[in-house]
Swiss-Prot record:
The lineage of its organism: Bacteria, Pseudomonadati, Pseudomonadota, Gammaproteobacteria, Enterobacterales. GO terms for molecular function: DNA-binding transcription factor activity; sequence-specific DNA binding. It comes from the Bacteria. It comes from Escherichia coli. Homodimer. This is HTH-type transcriptional activator CsvR. SUPFAM superfamilies: Homeodomain-like. Keywords: Activator, DNA-binding, Plasmid, Transcription, Transcription regulation. Residues 183-204, 230-253 bind DNA. InterPro entries: Homeodomain-like_sf, HTH_AraC, HTH_AraC-typ_CS, Tscrpt_reg_AraC-type_HTH. Disulfide bonds: none annotated. Transcriptional activator of fimbrial genes in enterotoxigenic E.coli.
Amino acid sequence: MDFKYTEEKELIKINNVMIHKYTILYTSNCILDISFGEDKITCFNNRLVFLERGVNISVRIQKQKLTEKPYVAFRLNENVLRHLKNTLMIIYGMSKIDSCECRGVSRKIMTTEVDKMLLNVLREMMGHHNDDSSFISALIYLISKIKCNDKIIESLYMSSITFFTDKVRGVIEKDLSRKWTLAIIADVFNVSEITIRKRLESEDTNFNQILMQSRMSKAALLLLENSYQISQISNMIGISSASYFIRIFNKHFGVTPKQFFNYFKGG
């Protein structure tokens, strides 16, 4: 992710945002512009946005009320995604999907307006965010009330597929404080470094990209928790110098950790 901070404090531009978990956004307090390749989607206030895992997007966020958070985000962990996908397959079924097929933006990023009924379901989901079973039930009900939900179901199915990149990221994220190298990853998978490199290249990525994305994404989430000092976050993601972490964060996102936190913290 590459964040560009503007002098207009209600506006932030973010490039190269990699969606590591299937994400549902509710634009409760913002207008959200999403760019995916040459395509652009504008999501006004009070809309739901479904983001497929693995997409790389750029966004422009403009708050309506400066003191509040711009949106509500639901990020589905592996367990929730798996159970949700299995249940939806039983309810709706699904014709054979080719994971290698070229799929356009309309099948990876979907939006819908939120009426009063959907808003009530969203509130229920917020109340059950720490209860997987109740959260999944509420989410299934929400999806059932969305017209033309077949693309959402297909996207959830695609997001449940595990690629080699996911396996490498999973190993790294178990201990981001470790000084990871390609050689260590090769030992974990009991293969050569060349094999690791080629398999990642076949998925259009490399070890350094995965490591940096994992560290910076975790740092951003830790900042939003507002529970740790900069020096603590730096150590937690494997960077020993706090000042170096600030420089890397600023280079990667385009804003300092403080600017990032202040924009997203809300009232």
